[in-house]
Amino acid sequence: MSGQGKRLMVMAGGTGGHVFPGLAVAHYLMAQGWQVRWLGTADRMEADLVPKHGIEIDFIRISGLRGKGIKALIAAPLRIFNAWRQARAIMKAYKPDVVLGMGGYVSGPGGLAAWSLGIPVVLHEQNGIAGLTNKWLAKIATKVMQAFPGAFPNAEVVGNPVRTDVLALPLPQQRLAGREGPVRVLVVGGSQGARILNQTMPQVAAKLGDSVTIWHQSGKGSQQSVEQAYAEAGQPQHKVTEFIDDMAAAYAWADVVVCRSGALTVSEIAAAGLPALFVPFQHKDRQQYWNALPLEKAGAAKIIEQPQLSVDAVANTLAGWSRETLLTMAERARAASIPDATERVANEVSRAARA
């Protein structure tokens, strides 16, 4: 699939859940000879992250409309129009053959600008319930893809592009068979941590005693307080780190994960082939619940929603999973994953550019 001379503009911003899958597709297509530029906003994570990956980035001024008050809503049409004009000028100069919208506020004006210039718009929805921007853009898109079934009624399910180091992990049977000793529990609340897990897991550790060993990612600024909580619970032996740079190594170490269920986390856990206890973030549209549901239905995970979360609920769940059960769940997780998601998205981008 040679893309010699073809030009792609990726539109993604705000959070890692939008940006990292976009980077995976960008690198895949760059290896095929494509030129790639990025459309983002100057005050979000993409501004620093994308240039580190050798990709030039253009900025437009746009932010979210949710919960901003009446003045912001009145000003919204003008802000969107100005952002559309900025995006249109950028695209007229760059002349992409196709644009790929991965979500975030930047995709809205960017997608409209591409459509107004006759440039094919390809969309990828990472979450189990569609975001507002992608709902709007789906009406004008050349192709709509989704990571999990249910975000769009008729869109192709292609999974989420995940990092190659996670995809390269040995399969569960090779990795987990023959493991003995305490069950290795990886606790991850996302890069920001999750206060509810930071508060709950030290007490869970006290209940489970030496049947588990825990590696707990606390999130920025929380390492000391979480270490103290484990010590006060009589469990100082467990490892607490603020951030985990090498998630593939953490997944390779773990027997089971206790975590939030952001789209990328769920897809990585499936690709790694790991059982999980998901505690979805309480978003009003239950986005993280819908992300986790396919793995629970596959018998690879359990969901405990935050109102039902307790020390006993977590401790009893983990205590009830034997090593044999964990291996079966791990194999089901891997079977439910879509390891070639990056290639699938890239192929649709190529197809749209040729159309």
From Swiss-Prot:
<keyword id="KW-0131">Cell cycle</keyword>
<keyword id="KW-0133">Cell shape</keyword>
<feature type="binding site">
    <location>
        <begin position="263"/>
        <end position="268"/>
    </location>
    <ligand>
        <name>UDP-N-acetyl-alpha-D-glucosamine</name>
    </ligand>
</feature>
<keyword id="KW-0961">Cell wall biogenesis/degradation</keyword>
<dbReference type="GO" id="GO:0005975">
    <property type="term" value="P:carbohydrate metabolic process"/>
</dbReference>
<feature type="binding site">
    <location>
        <begin position="15"/>
        <end position="17"/>
    </location>
    <ligand>
        <name>UDP-N-acetyl-alpha-D-glucosamine</name>
    </ligand>
</feature>
<dbReference type="GO" id="GO:0050511">
    <property type="term" value="F:undecaprenyldiphospho-muramoylpentapeptide beta-N-acetylglucosaminyltransferase activity"/>
</dbReference>
<dbReference type="GO" id="GO:0030259">
    <property type="term" value="P:lipid glycosylation"/>
</dbReference>
<feature type="binding site">
    <location>
        <position position="191"/>
    </location>
    <ligand>
        <name>UDP-N-acetyl-alpha-D-glucosamine</name>
    </ligand>
</feature>
<keyword id="KW-0808">Transferase</keyword>
<dbReference type="GO" id="GO:0009252">
    <property type="term" value="P:peptidoglycan biosynthetic process"/>
</dbReference>
<keyword id="KW-0328">Glycosyltransferase</keyword>
<dbReference type="InterPro" id="IPR004276">
    <property type="entry name" value="GlycoTrans_28_N"/>
</dbReference>
<feature type="binding site">
    <location>
        <position position="244"/>
    </location>
    <ligand>
        <name>UDP-N-acetyl-alpha-D-glucosamine</name>
    </ligand>
</feature>
<feature type="binding site">
    <location>
        <position position="163"/>
    </location>
    <ligand>
        <name>UDP-N-acetyl-alpha-D-glucosamine</name>
    </ligand>
</feature>
<dbReference type="GO" id="GO:0005886">
    <property type="term" value="C:plasma membrane"/>
</dbReference>
<keyword id="KW-0132">Cell division</keyword>
<keyword id="KW-0573">Peptidoglycan synthesis</keyword>
<feature type="binding site">
    <location>
        <position position="127"/>
    </location>
    <ligand>
        <name>UDP-N-acetyl-alpha-D-glucosamine</name>
    </ligand>
</feature>
<dbReference type="GO" id="GO:0051301">
    <property type="term" value="P:cell division"/>
</dbReference>
<keyword id="KW-1003">Cell membrane</keyword>
<comment type="similarity">
    <text>Belongs to the glycosyltransferase 28 family. MurG subfamily.</text>
</comment>
<dbReference type="GO" id="GO:0051991">
    <property type="term" value="F:UDP-N-acetyl-D-glucosamine:N-acetylmuramoyl-L-alanyl-D-glutamyl-meso-2,6-diaminopimelyl-D-alanyl-D-alanine-diphosphoundecaprenol 4-beta-N-acetylglucosaminlytransferase activity"/>
</dbReference>
<feature type="binding site">
    <location>
        <position position="288"/>
    </location>
    <ligand>
        <name>UDP-N-acetyl-alpha-D-glucosamine</name>
    </ligand>
</feature>
<dbReference type="InterPro" id="IPR006009">
    <property type="entry name" value="GlcNAc_MurG"/>
</dbReference>
<comment type="function">
    <text>Cell wall formation. Catalyzes the transfer of a GlcNAc subunit on undecaprenyl-pyrophosphoryl-MurNAc-pentapeptide (lipid intermediate I) to form undecaprenyl-pyrophosphoryl-MurNAc-(pentapeptide)GlcNAc (lipid intermediate II).</text>
</comment>
<dbReference type="InterPro" id="IPR007235">
    <property type="entry name" value="Glyco_trans_28_C"/>
</dbReference>
<dbReference type="GO" id="GO:0008360">
    <property type="term" value="P:regulation of cell shape"/>
</dbReference>
<protein>
    <recommendedName>
        <fullName>UDP-N-acetylglucosamine--N-acetylmuramyl-(pentapeptide) pyrophosphoryl-undecaprenol N-acetylglucosamine transferase</fullName>
        <ecNumber>2.4.1.227</ecNumber>
    </recommendedName>
</protein>
<dbReference type="Pfam" id="PF03033">
    <property type="entry name" value="Glyco_transf_28"/>
</dbReference>
<keyword id="KW-0997">Cell inner membrane</keyword>
<comment type="pathway">
    <text>Cell wall biogenesis; peptidoglycan biosynthesis.</text>
</comment>
<dbReference type="Pfam" id="PF04101">
    <property type="entry name" value="Glyco_tran_28_C"/>
</dbReference>
<dbReference type="GO" id="GO:0071555">
    <property type="term" value="P:cell wall organization"/>
</dbReference>
<keyword id="KW-0472">Membrane</keyword>
